[in-house]
């Protein structure tokens, strides 16, 4: 979050590094004492022909600039910007010549589930002053789902991707639907019974024509839930990280919260450990927000 994110390569740069929010203040003397650890770490990686990803990005930028390599791109479009770190954005900036409509970024600070990658565009050579727009209308999620999902983010820092804060109050959804139901259980057996009952409810009548996904907080919980539902005779499928998802209404899908990003279903059941809400970082709450807002029509939550 400091050395790699800021592209620091020597002791002098580390002395000047920003360490906002780190909790512990390091004096100049302490920074000098700590720096050899980073140097040795990079030396050990290099001896094994390895690099940290952020260092690889930084080296690629140096090659593009110092060697004067002509870009093959006239424009770059970037989605999920909130999950890119500073060095990745600097590389994108270096990959296309500055000009009209050279870079287009789309992102949502509410869905930043990798806090260590937090970046401000203006600090990465991307000037968006007077050129940014906030989109306040939610076309996917019902207003009821949106409000409950936002409640999980209460107290979380939501940024605007450029060192500013985002205001959640101005957002609204165009569609309406049932208020999300939340149930909490003390063991997996009770949670499993609830899950099976909800799956049965959501696959009857008109709801049977809608797509359904169970989104879990871990692979272990996802696999457990899938096995329980499969034993009830339902057709099931796991959405893996390295595959696309072709949604069919006769199949119950199972995904982790991280994999669910970018997906959408008519109906979603979120299955989460209670510890996710107790996480000291904002990441757990943002994962719940992401999971709930994958639903177009209805979202339900089970804590165990």
Explain the meaning of each model-derived region.
Residues 1-30:
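ATP-hydrolysis module of ASCE/P-loop NTPase motor domains
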Residues 27-30, 36-50, 62-71, 75-290, ...:
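Conserved helicase motor core of SF1/SF2 NTP-dependent helicases
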Residues 2, 59, 109:
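Short acidic/histidine-centered micro-motifs embedded in hydrophobic/aromatic stretches
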Residues 11-17, 50-58:
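Short coil/turn segments at secondary-structure boundaries
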